[in-house]
């Protein structure tokens, strides 16, 4: 099991020093690469997950077709599920065209994981359809899902800890206050393939931004499979 950790929200400014909240997400299926990419992969597709640290944890993901044939996403059977509230993917796709060599880097916004490897131009389109095609060796991005419009709070959890030293809350899988499920139904050669990845928060940390300055901007293995990815606001 990998622990995926990202800056979830900037809390506020106190004496010109920003407080931040860091959320650790665990997943039984999503992996963290050496390059800090959160991804799932099978023989048909690779799914990369992005958390936009500048927009209150805006959630996006890409599906890369690893085959030479077209595959399709069944939008009516694909969902973003945030703490039990389901949102379908209808009208939320953006096309990214990539080449066979996957050699160069393409940045997508301010996301934690933000590179596509491509040797061709990148095109973006919006679409509203029941089925969305992904050509062979291409990728499509789905974006616009908000995890929350505020940081996590609970009674006794200090938002502005003394001198900025970390204030910590930990949870097990069953009691997690944040559970995100990404369910995708692919049509491959006329057959349905359902991919479901769950990510759940197991730790929240409130602290001054500069407390974590030493880890910025790379992911580092701090032991016990804990990965911290820190970005400035």
Question: Where on the chain are the PLM-derived regions?
Answer:
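Asparagine-centered strand-capping/turn motif at beta-strand->loop junctions
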Residues: 61-70, 82
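Terminal connector regions
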Residues: 143, 147-222
């Amino acid at each position: 099991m990998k622990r995926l950790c990202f800056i979830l929200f900037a809390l506020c400014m106190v004496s010109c020093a920003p407080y931040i909240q860091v959320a650790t997400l665990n997943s039984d299926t999503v992996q963290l690469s050496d390059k800090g990419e959160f991804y799932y992969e099978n023989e048909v597709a690779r799914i990369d997950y992005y958390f936009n640290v500048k927009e209150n944890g805006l959630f996006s993901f890409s599906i890369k077709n690893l085959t030479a044939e077209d595959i399709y996403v069944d939008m009516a059977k694909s969902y973003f599920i945030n703490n039990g509230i389901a949102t379908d993917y209808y009208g939320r796709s953006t096309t990214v065209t990539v080449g066979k060599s996957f050699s160069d880097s393409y940045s997508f916004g301010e996301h934690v994981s933000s590179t596509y490897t491509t040797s061709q131009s990148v095109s973006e389109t919006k679409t509203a359809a029941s089925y969305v095609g992904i050509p062979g060796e291409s990728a499509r991005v789905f974006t616009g899902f908000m995890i929350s419009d505020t940081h996590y709070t609970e009674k006794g959890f200090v938002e502005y800890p003394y001198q900025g030293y970390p204030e910590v809350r930990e949870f097990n899988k069953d009691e997690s206050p944040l559970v995100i499920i990404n369910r995708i139904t692919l049509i491959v050669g006329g057959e349905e393939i359902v991919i479901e990845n769950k990510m759940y928060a197991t730790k929240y940390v409130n602290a001054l931004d500069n407390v974590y300055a030493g880890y910025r901007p790379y992911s580092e293995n701090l032991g016990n499979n804990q990965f911290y990815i820190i970005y400035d606001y």
